[in-house]
């Protein structure tokens, strides 16, 4: 089982990053993709991945929250990072019209620029979409023939949005959001609609701690070592064996991100 979304650069991991990675290994997690959300964190993510060759990789990109800081210098930084063997995707990039930390036009500009970069470098894209599906799809669609792959990270949309993402050829990233009885029930019902070869799993640690873990962790911080719980629950709701699902999502991640 491979965790495609770990925010290991977060200050919440500042005191025990190495132990976090060790616990993930001990839990049977077969690899980690460390998320880059701005130029600085993308550089930090690449360095962290360097420390764990063959186990950790990273993305390089600018999250829509940070889109207002996009510049030609940012693009050049990402391009340089993408030359390293650790960086296997462009992103996290996309649109977030829920919190609007950057203006919509800034988000759209940075998103389009990163799709162009991914097409140029022939790297898959690690996508973010929240309450912005129509504009997200409109910007993404023209680039699809030029992209080598894409995943809708932390998908939390509707059935119609899921069907649209699948029709665009996207892989679907599912997090512990689906384990939340308050807001994950609709998503839970959609799990069987995702083709096995398009499904990816992620913790989005330190965020989105699964709410249905028993006993509950003493800390509210999520960790990649909790991925087996997500695998177990998603397998249950898809009516398949957890071991089979774990092997499938590991295979899917390695295929999408072209890992050795």
UniProtKB/Swiss-Prot annotation:
The keyword ATP-binding does not apply. Its cofactor is Mg(2+). GO terms for cellular component: cytoplasm. A divalent metal cation binds at residues 92, 128, 153. CDD domains: TatD_DNAse. Its EC number is 3.1.11.-, 3.1.13.-. GO terms for molecular function: 3'-5'-RNA exonuclease activity; magnesium ion binding; single-stranded DNA 3'-5' DNA exonuclease activity. It holds the Pfam family TatD_DNase. Belongs to the metallo-dependent hydrolases superfamily. TatD-type hydrolase family. TatD subfamily. 3'-5' exonuclease that prefers single-stranded DNA and RNA. May play a role in the H(2)O(2)-induced DNA damage repair. Monomer. This is 3'-5' ssDNA/RNA exonuclease TatD. It comes from Pantoea sp. (strain At-9b). The gene is tatD.
